[in-house]
């Protein structure tokens, strides 16, 4: 269920500012999005797993705060990130 090192490296390569970038908001949002998608799939199978549901809500809140920060700092980076991640239909 947790992200493997290979998955993290692939995501950071796509969304980070450079290969070893782990701190930029884009990289953090991309990693959170992957974790959110994985947890959502888990909860489809295990509907009564309320402990994981709370963790999902915490991750969604953290991603929302990071996206809000990116939108305040640079709207074009925000729009690009949203489009690349497939958020906001």
Curated annotation (Swiss-Prot):
Gene3D superfamilies: 6.10.250.3130, S15/NS1, RNA-binding (1.10.287.10). This is Small ribosomal subunit protein uS15. The keyword Ribosomal protein applies. GO terms for molecular function: rRNA binding; structural constituent of ribosome. One of its GO terms (biological process) is translation. Belongs to the universal ribosomal protein uS15 family. Pfam families: Ribosomal_S15. Coiled coil: none annotated. Part of the 30S ribosomal subunit. Forms a bridge to the 50S subunit in the 70S ribosome, contacting the 23S rRNA. The keyword Ribonucleoprotein applies. GO terms for cellular component: cytosolic small ribosomal subunit. Signal peptide: none annotated. One of the primary rRNA binding proteins, it binds directly to 16S rRNA where it helps nucleate assembly of the platform of the 30S subunit by binding and bridging several RNA helices of the 16S rRNA. Forms an intersubunit bridge (bridge B4) with the 23S rRNA of the 50S subunit in the ribosome. Keywords: Ribonucleoprotein, Ribosomal protein, RNA-binding, rRNA-binding.
